[in-house]
């Protein structure tokens, strides 16, 4: 089967934003206008096509990224293939955003025209910066009370430090929003309300907006000619670029992430969506426009690149595992190079296991079509993979490569969970393991002392939804404990410890002596190990045992048994015995050595500090600040945003449970907040004593 669409006609993009900026509605409109959805789904009646898990339809938020393939005819009359990923905007699900950005070529960042740049907008923007994803901006909800396009443009500069290139100006705002001015063509598009947004009239720019349109077109040209010397020279000599040249320069600057073209409209009222789709074709990259994917040779560890080309060896990245009620486990993968055929065998280079592709599916939200072959640039769902997890590389077994892996955040909250009936114990274990395979930011472990099952995640909502999915998808009812904070421990001063491990029973004994300096790691929260052994006092082959021994006890600190962060260990001396020494003996010695040293190294308890932003009407500012202070919060600042005030604070996670209920009653339901993990900080001594007493009793 030959490729149906040329790779330069592909656009792989996602839609990213703050919760409630209208992502799912915008995606719905895109699917409607590109002919994939016959009935427009509204989020508030629970019918949106992309939100296909039951919980999403109930809560009106998008939880998992659903991948959809659809098609659009550009301004040149040529059909393009769109692979769209809908991403969640709730902070508990930033992992979903992160993994979809990793496999996309471009993105549309959505803003709520009333709120502008919100806290979660900043979070997803930073994630997109990390992967250098070209972005366009769509200022949505222009029909909303308080909508202010120009303030949103300013906030992109002040809050994101980014350059927005304004491509359209709104005609009217709030309930008077009628259409947009196209600053390239210099005409106005007015939508016909009765046509569900399918039709619009191209008219002259309204008289009262002509001067503003001229001013913004001038700004647009000034910004885009800066990226091209010849265009800049021509412009300085008084020669304006023509419309095609402007589009070409906007495309180049967008793909090079120099600036971000900005559009406006209202997806809910069906205005502005089609020009946005034309802009996806005009300005977002095809797989050929982005740098080749980097990886390392599976055998030699040499750096290699794979290009978006069907003729190159197959390489793809598994970016999501999903449980499908009809097909079972589905692995979503982005093909970077080569071709994939149904039934073929691929190598998982991370696990060093071969996998057979049973079925290959093209997904449209939650409907699917079987395909026989897929090509470079495609995003496909694969059935039948047994060993593959998120972030694994799948490739041609004869040309193995390991692509750059994704980074996943550590969970900050945990709860104990048990099945309501004894018979469900096994089913619960199976369900939790399945859900953990789907979501790398969700962990399951068994508490060694109590035997309880502990689940950990990114927030209360995250764990609520896990428990809910267990009930719905796996029919397991569970009791959950109160949320527990994922505390950590560290050391605060340097100490030197000399420890000898000797064991003599009949036959071969055990002997190992180690002298180690332990100190806080100046480079961050990871564990760092160094050996400064000279002269062979500890033979080379035993040194990994020393490191392994220390690492094995870092999972349980001396104060209350929490994992330890930010420790550096330097092996400076030791001794061995020709017969009685072994890797195991050195492992045991270093383990005991660290346990002794940790008592003297000023162990300290750390707690997760959350970055909290509260958006509240002015009347409640005093109450909100007072309440945050009472939660040991540190107020970082406040700013006015329209008629609301935004309060930023760092607050310990331990004091933020059920905050949403307090905030609601304090503000009569008018204030909102977002919370993301910021850093670990020392716990004040009076609080630390309580925590130690509580947890030491459990250990």
UniProtKB/Swiss-Prot annotation:
Name one cellular component (GO) term: cytoplasm
**What's its job?**
Catalyzes the GTP-dependent ribosomal translocation step during translation elongation. During this step, the ribosome changes from the pre-translocational (PRE) to the post-translocational (POST) state as the newly formed A-site-bound peptidyl-tRNA and P-site-bound deacylated tRNA move to the P and E sites, respectively. Catalyzes the coordinated movement of the two tRNA molecules, the mRNA and conformational changes in the ribosome.
Q: Which family does it belong to?
A: Belongs to the TRAFAC class translation factor GTPase superfamily. Classic translation factor GTPase family. EF-G/EF-2 subfamily.
Gene name for this UniProt entry: fusA
**Which organism does this record belong to?**
Rhizobium etli (strain CIAT 652)
Any single GO molecular-function term of the entry would be: GTP binding
Answer yes or no on keyword Membrane. Answer: no
InterPro entries from the UniProt entry: EF-G-like_DII (IPR053905), EFG_II (IPR041095), EFG_III (IPR009022), EFG_III/V (IPR035647), EFG_IV (IPR047872), EFG_V (IPR035649), EFG_V-like (IPR000640), G_TR_CS (IPR031157)
Grouped into one coarse class, the protein's main location is cytoplasm
Q: Where in the cell is it found?
A: Cytoplasm
Key words, A-Z: Cytoplasm, Elongation factor, GTP-binding, Nucleotide-binding, Protein biosynthesis
Sorted alphabetically, the Gene Ontology BP terms of this entry are: ribosome disassembly
Instruction: Give me the disulphide-bonded residues.
Output: none
The tr-type G domain covers 8-288
Q: Where do the annotations place GTP binding?
A: 17-24, 86-90, 140-143
What is this protein's name?
Answer: Elongation factor G
């Amino acid at each position: 089967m030959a490729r149906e669409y040329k790779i330069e006609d592909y656009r792989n993009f996602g839609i990213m934003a703050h919760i409630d900026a209208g992502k799912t509605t915008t995606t719905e409109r895109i699917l409607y206008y590109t002919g994939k959805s016959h009935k427009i789904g509204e989020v508030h009646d629970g019918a949106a096509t992309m939100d296909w898990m039951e919980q999403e339809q109930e809560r009106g938020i998008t939880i998992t990224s659903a991948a959809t393939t659809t098609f659009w005819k550009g301004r040149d009359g040529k059909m393009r293939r769109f692979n769209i990923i809908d991403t969640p905007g709730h902070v508990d699900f930033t992992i979903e955003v992160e993994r979809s950005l990793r496999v996309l070529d471009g993105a549309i960042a959505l803003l709520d025209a009333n709120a502008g740049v919100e806290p979660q907008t900043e979070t997803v923007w930073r994630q997109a910066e990390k992967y250098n994803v070209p972005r366009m901006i769509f200022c949505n909800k222009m029909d909303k009370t308080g909508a202010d396009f120009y303030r949103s443009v300013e906030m992109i500069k002040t809050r994101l430090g980014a350059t927005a290139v304004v491509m359209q100006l709104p005609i009217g705002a709030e309930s008077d929003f009628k259409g947009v001015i196209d600053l390239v063509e210099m005409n106005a598009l007015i939508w016909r309300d009765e046509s569900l947004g399918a039709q619009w009239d191209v008219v002259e720019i309204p008289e009262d907006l002509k001067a503003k349109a001229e001013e913004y077109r001038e700004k647009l040209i000034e910004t885009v000619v800066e990226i091209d010397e010849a265009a800049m020279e021509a412009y300085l000599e008084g020669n304006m670029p023509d419309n095609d040249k402007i589009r070409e320069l906007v495309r180049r600057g967008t793909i090079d992430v120099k600036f971000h073209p900005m559009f406006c409209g209202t997806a809910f009222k069906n205005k502005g969506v089609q020009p946005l789709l034309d802009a996806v074709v005009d300005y977002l990259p095809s797989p050929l426009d982005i740098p080749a994917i980097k990886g390392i040779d599976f055998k030699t560890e040499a750096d290699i690149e794979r290009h978006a080309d069907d003729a190159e060896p197959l390489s793809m990245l598994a970016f999501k595992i999903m449980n499908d009620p009809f097909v079972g486990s589905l692995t979503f993968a982005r093909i970077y190079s080569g071709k994939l055929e149904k039934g073929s065998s691929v190598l998982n280079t991370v696990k060093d296991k071969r996998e057979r592709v049973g079925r290959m599916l093209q997904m449209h939200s939650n409907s699917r079509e079987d395909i026989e072959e897929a090509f470079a640039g495609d995003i496909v769902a694969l059935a039948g993979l047994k060993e593959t997890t998120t972030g694994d590389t799948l490739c041609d077994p004869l040309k193995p490569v390991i692509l750059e892996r994704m980074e996943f955040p550590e969970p900050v909250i945990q709860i104990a969970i048990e099945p309501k009936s004894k018979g469900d114990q096994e089913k619960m274990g199976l369900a939790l393991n399945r859900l953990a395979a789907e979501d790398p930011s969700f962990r399951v472990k068994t508490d060694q002392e109590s035997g309880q099952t502990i689940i950990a995640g990114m927030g209360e909502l995250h764990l609520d939804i896990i428990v809910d999915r267990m009930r719905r998808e796996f029919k397991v009812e569970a009791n959950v404990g109160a949320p527990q904070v994922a505390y950590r421990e560290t050391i605060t001063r340097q100490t030197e410890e000399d420890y000898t491990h000797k064991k003599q029973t009949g036959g071969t004994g055990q002997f190992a002596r180690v002298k180690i300096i332990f100190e806080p790691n100046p480079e961050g929260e990871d564990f760092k190990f160094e050996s400064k052994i000279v002269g062979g006092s500890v033979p080379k082959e035993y040194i990994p045992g020393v490191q392994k021994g220390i690492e094995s006890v870092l999972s349980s600190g001396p104060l209350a048994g929490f994992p330890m962060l930010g420790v550096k260990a330097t092996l400076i001396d030791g001794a061995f015995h020709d017969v009685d020494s072994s890797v195991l003996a050195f492992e045991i010695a270093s383990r005991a050595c660290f346990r002794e040293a940790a008592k003297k190294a000023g162990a300290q308890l750390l707690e997760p500090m959350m970055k909290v932003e509260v958006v509240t009407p002015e009347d409640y500012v005093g109450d909100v600040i007072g309440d945050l202070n009472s939660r040991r919060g540190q107020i970082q600042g406040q700013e006015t945003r329209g008629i609301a005030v935004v309060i930023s604070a760092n607050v310990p996670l331990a004091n933020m449970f059920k905050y949403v209920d307090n905030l609601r009653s304090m503000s009569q339901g008018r204030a909102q907040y977002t919370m993301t993990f910021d850093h670990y900080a020392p716990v004040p001594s009076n609080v630390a004593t309580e925590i130690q007493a509580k947890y030491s009793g459990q250990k």
